[in-house]
Amino acid sequence: TEFGIVVELGATKIRRKLAELEGDEAYPQNIRLMAQCVREQVGMLDQRLAECERQIARQSKNDPVVARLRSRPGIGLLSADAIVATVGDARQFKNGRQFAASLGITPRQHGSGGKTHLGAITRRGDSYLRCLFVQGARCVLQAALRLHKNKPDTLNRLQLWMVKLNDRVGYHKAAVAIANKHARQVWAMLTRGETYNADAYKDWEAAHANVCPGDIHRASDDDLSTAALAAASV
């Protein structure tokens, strides 16, 4: 603006800046009144959003499917409710790969000379669900990175995989890969009525001690439970 006011992106930063402008007498009165008006509008929007979230929580309180999905880290109330409302019967997808592809979080494939190359994600399908999955993936990735920095000895198997993936391909690609994994696991949870268990892979590996890791990765989603998918993640 003509007053050189710059506001960083982010709801918290905007609220903080508006409060600063409102109380800064270095700016004209009309600028401070405008900041107050905008701050009040933001407050009203916050109240409406909070009421919408409470309404969704009331509607989903007794929904066992929503409860199962929320057991998966990275899947919150809004994401679980949106998945249930949008996907419907997950059995319409042959496997978890198809479900992830329907959200546009699988890489494009193109071949030349008998070789297959993977490109950027397709970005097809429901953009809102894709956004929710990616945001959830970012949350769990950030949590894993913070834990790796402060208490690396407490990382679990899946968090260690996330940290290594982030080091190998970078933050944004890692987040999309994690979102893809979440989508495949959500498909398994929906079709089998399973609750997520981060340690379930231990029982699965004990029962399949003679199966090499490569066989796990080559198996189809129809042959894998959420426990096996967790084991295949690493």
Please give the residue ranges for each predicted region.
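A detector of single, family-specific signature residues
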Residues: T1-V234
